[in-house]
Amino acid sequence: MRILQLHCDRIEYSPVKKEIAAAEEPATGGKLEDAVLAFVAVEKGDGPGEAARAAAELRQALGRIGCKKLLIYPYAHLSSTLAAPSIALGLISEMEAALHDLEVSRAPFGWTKSYTISVKGHPLAEGFKVITGDARGTGAPKALESESSMKSTWHVLTPDGNMTDASEFDFAGCPKLKALARYEASKKRGTDEPPPHVALMKRMGIADYEPASDAGNMKFFPNGRLIKSLIERYVTERVVEYGGYEVETPIMYDSNHPSMVSYFNRFPARQYSIDSEGKSLFLRFAACFGQFLMAGDYQLSYKNLPFRLYELTRYSFRREQSGELVGLRRLRAFTMPDCHAFCTDMAQAVREAGVRFELSRDVIGQLGLDAADYEMAIRLTEEFYAENGGAVREMVRRHGRPVLVEMWKERFFYFVLKWEFNYIDGAGKASALSTDQIDVENGKRYGIEFVDENNGRQHPVILHNSPSGAIERVIYTLLEKAAADSARGTKPELPLWLSPVQARIIPVGEELVRNATELAKEMAGHGIRADVDDRNESMGKRIREAEKEWVRYILVVGEKEAASGRLSVRDRRTGKSTEMGLDDLVEAVREQTAGKPSAGLNSPFYLSKRPQVML
């Protein structure tokens, strides 16, 4: 932020012409005598921290001069790296509010203005200041600072409907819920040590950091891309089955679009911003923007509601703090299944939330998480709970375990209810997976309307649901769960339908590679991902490597198996080998992968043809 400060005998200004669409209305001129004029340019990266320090420095300067009149004058010509107008206006307004005890006024923002000034002649009459970020960086946006200072109360709601203050609840028997409560109380999101999944994602050839990109942007190797695509397909199939219309929307939006300004002002420092042909754009952090704008293109009747739009965003972007970025747990670019339901009123929204709650429970379970693997949190206003407490308690009853509740006296966000399933890792860090929100603001903000039973026009209540959470975070959760299993002495594994290789065929000798190949192709015809370890390595080494890659079924093909057509199948779970027919193996795999999408191998058929990933 840059400020040119002038102590003036007289200041007179008048708005002449609008410069931008977001210019303030109404715009009036003014005349002041014996006042300090502060020309202010807000720059990219500025936040409330800079606004607060600028206000403090102006206060000190006026104190030294002995003047109590101040005119804040937006003045773009002091910098070539200006912030988006929506951000600049917000920060200048914050400066004005911080100096409310002075005789402070502000020239209208976004206008070409004529002005006349007469500057006094004393040593302190003129000054220039550059306000930069403090040691913590560029400061958080107002909404985030307000969020961090918000007062809420914490409770635990049990399946029998009892609400207890969290400080008085007996967490014995609920260690993960206790960890979630501690995590929320501490507000510490960083980590001191890399969680176990980081080593696993590299060793398993799933994903790794990309130094050539921004932090929090990952690269996925063939194994990781296969796992990720299968999860994406499954979640999408379930949402479409539920009634979602799958759509696709842009990844970037105009920061100054009328529908975006108030929304974007909530979290400006968390966005990637880019300039294009004079436009200030930001990269979406969810599918909300595109889906809300698209909903406005529809002619909706109450008969069409709930109206459900769905998009799998590849990608959503959020500039999380660098100290919070770790592995697949928290990223700056991520894949998010995002389904919005537009409802007639709160009653319909509450009913729809119940349907989506069950959808999310089932999806997260089918992805490989048991109910005991995650903890539930609910955030809501006192008013919403007073009016809809029965529905909230029913949700907790169906969850079947105590739930952490954060209750606000007043609504700060656009939603009145938000619930989420949180995975608690070995370090006690919580990561939200499935979630839903009841939004009472954005229907009006985006001009979304439907015709009610009386032919009146109404704004819908909107639900924001991700039945799984970010796809990358699902993979993180599965790897962390596998690491925890390993620490307990259980063999780590992925769900069979997500295993990059479900069966590995190991021929005893080179002369049996052809038999192994025919068997693998036959298995592929039944939807089983099978490969052939044709390398000139010992049988023991090849079996050990298959175990290290978490291959569930290991088939050894010798002369006996080639002649009889029977299979010697080693189940990695038990470590035991069993003789069976191909039909038996196919049936076993089908039972474990029923209802899930299938795909072929995403790497060469023969292990001898595969290059090694050096991680």
From Swiss-Prot:
Region listing for Catalytic, in residue ranges: 196-495
User: Which GO biological process categories is it annotated with?
Assistant: threonyl-tRNA aminoacylation
- Gene Ontology cellular component? cytoplasm
Q: Which residues form the signal peptide?
A: none
Q: Which cofactor does it need?
A: Zn(2+)
Which Pfam families does the record match to this protein?
HGTP_anticodon, tRNA-synt_2b, tRNA-Thr_ED
Q: Which domain of life is it from?
A: Archaea
Q: Which reaction does it catalyse?
A: tRNA(Thr) + L-threonine + ATP = L-threonyl-tRNA(Thr) + AMP + diphosphate + H(+)
Q: What this chain does, per the record?
A: Catalyzes the attachment of threonine to tRNA(Thr) in a two-step reaction: L-threonine is first activated by ATP to form Thr-AMP and then transferred to the acceptor end of tRNA(Thr). Also edits incorrectly charged L-seryl-tRNA(Thr).
State how it assembles.
Answer: Homodimer.
Q: What is this protein called?
A: Threonine--tRNA ligase
Its source organism is: Cenarchaeum symbiosum (strain A)
Q: List the top taxonomic levels of the source.
A: Archaea, Nitrososphaerota, Candidatus Cenarchaeales, Candidatus Cenarchaeaceae, Candidatus Cenarchaeum
